[in-house]
Structures are given as C-alpha cells and as structure tokens.
C-alpha cells in the first residue's frame, strides 16, 4: 500500500521541509511554506512523459551530434515573432505570464486561430468549449485545424495529444493542470513542478512546441515554484494597465533569442492589434502651448519610439511635499530633483511634484532623464517647450548629460515623426553620418546648457 506523508513546501523556490519554517533557508523568503500531502509511487507505475525512460537514453559524443539550424514556426504575428526571436522553435516550451484579464488567453487564441496549415490543440482548464467559441467569434478568425480540449487531468491530455498529433500545443493554464502522480490540489508547488516537467519532456521527445499560460502572484512574478521559470525555454511577460488600451509583451528569458525584444499591442473589442509604430499612438497633438510636457526619444528593448513626459509642479498644501511618479522610478525622480536643486539652482523643496509617462507605459530607459527634468522645470516656470523639440540623455549626479546608446535610432525616429530639433549629449555622434539627417541636432554637456536651449 502506498503511504502518504505530509511535507511543507516553499511556494517561492520549491524547497521542502518535514516541518513548518517561518523563513525559507533556500531563498530567504518569509511565510512561504505551505502544507502538502505527497504520495510516493513506484517508478514503474508512473505514466507521465519522461518520468522513466527505462534505460533507453544513452550518452553520445558531442562530435557525433549533427548541428542543424533550429526550425522555427511562423506564428503570423510580427510582434510575437519578434519577441520570440523570429518564431517558435520546434520542441520548445514557452511560458506566458501576466495579470488576470490582461489578455493572455486572447493573445494566444487569436494567434492560434490565425495559423494556416498547422494542426493545433488548445487545452483549457479555465473555460468551457462554448466560452472559447464565443471568444473566437469575437476575434473573427477561423482555423479549421484548431482542436479544443477542456481538460485538467494531465494523463488524459497526453492521451489526446497522441490521438490529435498537434503541431502546436497550448495549455491554459499550468496552474489548473494536475497529475494523478501527486496527491495535492491543482496549482500547488508539487503539481506545477511535476506537470511542467512532464510537459517539457513531451515537447523535447515529440518536437512539438508548447505554449503555457501562467498566472502571476501579488509581487508580479510567475505564480508557483521558481523551477517553473528555470525549466522552460522562454518566459514572456504580458503587461499593461487595464485602464489603457496598450499591452506590452516582454521577453524575460529566451534560450533561442534576445531578451531585449519588445512587442506592443492595442486592445480592441475584436482582440489585440499589432502596433508597428507606437510613437504615433503615444504622442498627443494637443499639448502645444502647455507647460510641463517634454518629448523623449526612448528605446525599450531594441525599438525606438517617442514618449510624452508630463509633469505638474505646484505649491505644497501640506507640511511635507508630495512626490508621485507613474510609469517612472520614483527614487530616480527624487535624484533628478536633487540634481535640479544642487546643480541648476532651482528650489523645489516646498513644491509638490507629479510625474506621468503618457499612455500607461513603464519606461526604464535612463535616456529619458533629460525629458523628465525639462518637463518638471517647464511646469515650475510655467513656460512651455517649443513644439518640434525632442530630447534624450542620461543625467548624472554632477549635472552632466551622459551619452546614451543607439543614438542613431533615436534621431531617425524623431525625424520620421516630423520633429525639427533634438537635444542630445555631447560627443554622442561618433560614427553617425549626420548628412543623412535633415533635423537640427543640438549637443549639450550640462543641464544648464539644455535649459538655455529650451527656455532661453
């Protein structure tokens, strides 16, 4: 008779202990141990893919392995193909995470429905077949080779994969799938670990690419053990504010491509639309004559685009001035305010400062520092920045404007959108042929020089 025993498993890293521990000794997190019942079965009784290979796998010499370029599946979505590094590699396991309701299932379903000539199996553990049909009708795409399976038992899913023989497998979501090998509830650390390991083995043995949809926890990371992110080939993060129409697909881990890629979508009633030129959507046309607005030439991933930086500076009503930043690091904004006071002589100690990156984007590019302090100073002086001016540059603690990377892409993007002048760091044009650029390029060394160019 198989015996069951109780163990405590860390929900963050997957470490186990025979008794409850307040602080995990492996990852250092507090209060992450949860109780689970584990049933140890004989190896021969396990029916999962790859749990027991029966000694069939043998080591081979590295020189005997033929090296071939990996075959990629074109998903028909330029943004998704870009983030994946040119398409989906056969036999790869891709994890897509994001907040509830952000559009993960919509993104995957419309991609599957848009595929032609590929047999796909969409396994849903959260929605019924009728609910998926309603979603598919709203997207208005149709794939005659798309099979729908509403099942959460992993053993039954593998039975159906043998019958269907799909070219692409989608599982929505990994937290709803369970295996009979582990006696614990779906979504537990043990279930997620065992199921993901079995799915990985299926992908490698059959050569079928698999897309996993995963939930995120309150900290914003993928729910479940960290081993889930380690065993998959690619981790994609689908993010965005539900109050805005834009969604951003980022690559956190990619064994077959760059993690610097970025995909941008626009959420519509009929699904997600690819945004090939995000600058035209992120810039408004009605800010002329308004103070506190500066246009920054930013790069997210390897894509250049222009963003609108908005600032509001007002007298502090309460004793302690308020500092608020949306889409920008608050600590970095406080550092830039200190630079404004120390190096440029502008006193903002008794002022409330509010900063916003228009469009609901979260930007980590330090090259927008110059636009941030320019927008803040513009609002403080109540002087608008002349239309047609864009800028980029990192601001150092001594008030210097430091060079930024990919300056050519930033300049060409600003010129393409009709800007007549761009302010950039000094000596940032090495190797760039300015003759192919018609816009005026102004180079500055210090923040004071930039302010003289903007406000006279």
Where are the regions a protein language model picked out?
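P-loop (Walker A) phosphate-binding loop of NTP-binding proteins
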Residues: 99, 125
């Amino acid at each position: 008779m198989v015996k069951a025993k109780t163990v405590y498993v860390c929900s963050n890293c997957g470490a186990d202990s025979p008794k409850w521990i307040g602080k995990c000794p492996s990852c250092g997190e507090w209060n992450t141990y949860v109780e689970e019942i584990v049933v140890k079965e004989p190896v021969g009784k396990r029916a999962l893919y790859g749990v027991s290979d029966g000694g069939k796998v043998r080591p081979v010499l590295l020189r005997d392995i033929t090296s071939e370029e990996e075959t990629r599946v074109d998903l028909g979505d330029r943004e998704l193909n870009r983030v994946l590094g040119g398409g989906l590699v056969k036999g790869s396991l891709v994890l897509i995470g994001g907040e509830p309701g952000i559009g993960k299932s919509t993104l995957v379903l419309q991609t599957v429905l848009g595929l032609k000539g590929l047999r796909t199996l969409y396994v849903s553990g959260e929605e019924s077949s009728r609910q998926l049909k309603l979603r598919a009708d709203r997207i208005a795409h149709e794939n005659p080779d798309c099979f729908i399976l509403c099942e959460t038992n992993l053993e039954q899913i593998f039975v159906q994969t043998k019958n269907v023989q799909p070219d692409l497998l989608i599982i929505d979501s990994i937290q709803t799938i369970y295996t009979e090998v582990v006696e614990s509830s779906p979504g537990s650390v043990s279930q997620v670990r065992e199921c993901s390991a079995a799915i990985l083995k299926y992908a490698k043995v059959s050569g079928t690419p698999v897309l996993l949809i995963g939930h995120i926890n309150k900290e914003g990371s993928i729910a479940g053990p960290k081993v889930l992110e380690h065993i998959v080939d690619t981790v994609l993060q689908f993010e965005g504010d539900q109050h805005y129409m834009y969604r951003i697909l980022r690559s956190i881990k990619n064994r077959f491509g760059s993690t610097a890629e970025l995909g941008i979508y626009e959420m519509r009633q009929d699904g997600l639309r690819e945004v090939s030129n995000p600058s035209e959507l992120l810039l408004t046309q009605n800010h002329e004559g308004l103070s506190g607005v500066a246009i920054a030439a930013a790069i997210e991933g390897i894509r250049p685009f222009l963003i609108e930086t908005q600032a509001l500076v007002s007298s502090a009503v309460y004793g302690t001035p308020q500092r608020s930043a949306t889409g920008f690091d608050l600590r970095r904004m406080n550092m830039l305010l200190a630079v404004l006071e120390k190096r440029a002589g502008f006193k903002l100690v008794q002022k409330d400062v509010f900063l916003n990156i228009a469009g609901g984007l979260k930007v980590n590019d330090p090259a927008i520092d110059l636009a941030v302090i320019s927008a803040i100073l513009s609002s403080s002086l109540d002087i608008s920045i002349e239309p047609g001016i864009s800028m980029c540059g990192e601001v150092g603690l001594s008030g210097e404007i430091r060079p930024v990377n990919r300056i050519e892409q930033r300049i060409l993007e600003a010129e393409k959108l009709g800007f007549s002048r761009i302010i950039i760091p000094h000596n940032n044009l090495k190797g760039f042929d300015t003759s192919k650029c018609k816009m005026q390029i102004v180079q500055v060394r210090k923040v004071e020089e930039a302010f003289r160019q903007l406000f006279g």
